Swiss-Prot record:
It comes from the Viruses. It comes from Epstein-Barr virus (strain GD1). Its main location: virion. Residues 33-46, 92-98, 155-158, 239-240, 289-298, 357 are intravirion. Residues 1-11, 68-70, 122-133, 180-217, 262-267, 320-335 are virion surface. This is Protein BMRF2.
């Protein structure tokens, strides 16, 4: 049994790791909203808006790096992250021309920020389920803070409102070591120690083994994703559902996908129910979008994604359970949900940019 102090300590650490895991998405969100104006800076706008799918893809690529090399990158990464954020802060305050320097700064810092989701998720999803909810709460809170800053135009008024970004980096990077030292995490890691494996200290699931254990879960996630992408295309062309949402939807997609959703009961039943709700809601929006008005149409359109996230969360939770004996089970989860993030954010970019409703 573990003490209450150990649980509280780990809960605080994983909450801070949730703040840390949000930083690549917040970085993209801030640049896409503050510095992208299609009339005055067309190519910069495309760079910033493509940052969302790029961040998802880079987070997946970081999972291919061996754990010992990823851990060694922590100190240089945090130093360069903070330095880049300080330079951006200075440019916002003192410079009037950032049309070249800002995109270079954005592209230089983004790959290093994408290291944090990998390191955070690798720790969090080895811990008990209650601590995973703390992580998801931290990620959701961080995304919400910056979304509200943009809605209230606080970031446009003063660069001081970038300060939470520095706090997230400092708290999160400092919590990595604390979470690894916690006895609850180390006991979870010990349960994944290999006994008969010749390579490595812990059991690692290969691609073949993952496909063997979770074929139907992966197929169901793929089918749900294709369904919602088709819904996005049809509703964008017919009902103009992205009008007024293009500034906030990418952050919502990344944050909600990484956070999961509400999942209770059997995963296959939940997935079927959520797919049915997605289909019925999209039919309502398609035929009644003029009657619903802008607000009703937007609420129903967002609810389609909430249903989708809940279905994927149930399926990914089932995958993590099937891979619970493997130390890289959390990384398999990251690859699946962040590839879904990539598909949605890239699809949203193509629809809003090139296919006019």
């Amino acid at each position: 049994m573990f003490s209450c102090k150990q649980h509280l300590s780990l809960g605080a650490c994983v909450f801070c790791l949730g703040l840390l895991a949000s930083t690549p998405f917040i970085w993209c969100f801030v640049f896409a909203n503050l510095l992208s104006l299609e009339i005055f800076s067309p190519w910069q706008t495309h760079v910033y808006r493509l940052g969302f799918p790029t961040a998802c893809l880079m987070a997946v690529l970081w999972t291919l790096v061996p754990a010992k090399h990823a851990v060694r990158a922590v100190t240089p990464a945090i130093m360069l992250n903070i330095a880049s954020a300080l330079i951006f802060f200075s440019l916002r305050v003192y410079s009037t021309s950032t049309w070249v320097s800002a995109p270079c700064l954005f592209l230089a810092n983004l790959p290093l920020l994408c290291l944090w989701p990998r390191l955070a998720i690798e720790i969090v999803y080895i811990c008990p389920a209650i601590h995973q909810r703390f992580f998801e709460l931290g990620l959701l809170l961080a995304c919400t803070i910056f979304a509200l800053s943009v809605v209230s135009r606080a970031l446009e008024v003063s660069a001081v409102f970038m300060s939470p970004f520095f706090i997230f980096l400092a708290l999160g990077s400092g919590s990595l070591a604390g979470a690894r030292r916690n006895q609850i995490y180390t006991s979870g890691l010990e349960r994944r120690r290999s006994i008969f494996c010749a390579r490595g200290d812990h059991s690692v699931a290969s691609l073949k083994e993952t496909l063997h254990k979770c074929p139907w879960d992966l197929m169901a996630i793929s089918a749900l994703t294709v369904l919602v992408v088709c819904v996005m295309i049809v509703l964008h062309v017919h009902a103009e559902v992205f009008f007024g949402l293009s500034r906030y939807l990418p952050l919502f997609l990344c944050g909600a996908m990484a956070s999961g959703g509400l999942y209770l009961g059997h995963s296959s039943i939940i997935a079927c129910v959520m797919a049915t709700l997605c289909t019925l809601t999209s039919v309502v929006v398609y035929f009644l979008h003029e009657t619903l008005g802008p607000l009703g149409k937007t609420v129903l359109f967002i609810s389609i994604f909430v249903y989708y996230f809940s279905g994927v969360a149930a399926l990914s939770s089932a995958m993590r359970y099937k891979l619970k004996k493997f130390v890289n089970g959390p990384l398999v989860h990251l690859r699946v949900v962040y590839m879904c993030c990539f598909v949605f954010t890239f699809c949203e970019y193509l629809l809003v940019t090139f296919i006019k409703s």
